[in-house]
Regions:
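Fe-S ferredoxin-like electron-transfer domains
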Residues: 73, 77-78, 82-187
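Eukaryote-biased recognition of intrinsically disordered, low-complexity regulatory segments
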Residues: 15-26
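Short, isolated positions in well-ordered beta-strands
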Residues: 28-30
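Short Cys/His-rich Zn2+-coordinating modules
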Residues: 22, 53-59, 127-132, 184
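A basic, amphipathic helix-loop patch mediating RNA/tRNA/ribosome contacts
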Residues: 46-80
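Intrinsic disorder at enzyme termini
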Residues: 1-14
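Short, structural beta-strand-to-alpha-helix junction motif
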Residues: 35-48
């Protein structure tokens, strides 16, 4: 009895459309769709476009393999999209480039999908000020007492507090210290 090996060929996946966006003034091409945490194709988000542009956007709650909670707000960015006229066609500047209509408010980059011609601004003074405010509210009940922390200095909260100049909170309330469920000093190995 002989067996013949057969090679099964799978059809190539359809080419995913690429679109042009600008991240901090640098134009890049990114796929319109990317696989989400479950493998399903979903619209590419601003934070994914920034990662492809090698531009770091600080974040705590975003992870590419998990659903997007959008809770931490550290990934706030400013953005603009091509302005459209009454005929739904892009309004052009004198030099022929599309006029960009800047959004009146920031967006969380982990949950906002990109669109063709979008411009993303990750380091404007307004973005930095917003991140400082978000970080300050996160530090209200979190002491930066790193020697006793389990993370032992490998902590994004500590890194971002240094990057954004928040070594202490302006709020004078006492920190919330809850008792541990299990007193670790009683455990003997």
């Amino acid at each position: 009895m002989s067996t013949v090996a057969t090679t099964e060929t799978k059809p190539a996946p359809a080419a995913i459309e690429k679109i042009k966006v600008k991240v901090d003034g640098r134009e890049i091409e990114v796929p319109r769709l990317t696989a989400d945490w479950s493998g399903k194709l979903t619209p590419t988000t601003m934070i994914q476009a920034c990662e492809l542009a090698k531009t770091e956007v600080p974040h705590y709650c975003y992870h590419p393999k998990l659903p997007v909670p959008g809770n931490c707000r550290m990934c706030l960015v400013e953005y603009g999209t091509p302005a459209l006229g009454p005929d739904r066609k892009p309004v052009l500047n004198a030099d022929g480039t599309p006029k960009i209509a800047k959004s009146p408010r920031p967006a969380i980059s982990c949950a906002t999908p990109i669109s063709p011609g979008m411009e993303i601004y990750t380091s404007t003074p307004g973005v930095k000020q917003m991140r400082e405010g978000v970080l300050e509210s996160l530090l209200i009940n979190h002491p930066l007492d790193c020697p006793i922390c389990d993370q032992a200095g490998e902590c994004k909260l500590q890194e971002y507090s240094v990057d954004y100049g928040q070594s202490a909170s302006r709020f004078a309330e006492a920190k919330v210290h809850k008792p541990k469920a299990v007193d670790l000093s009683l455990i003997h190995i």
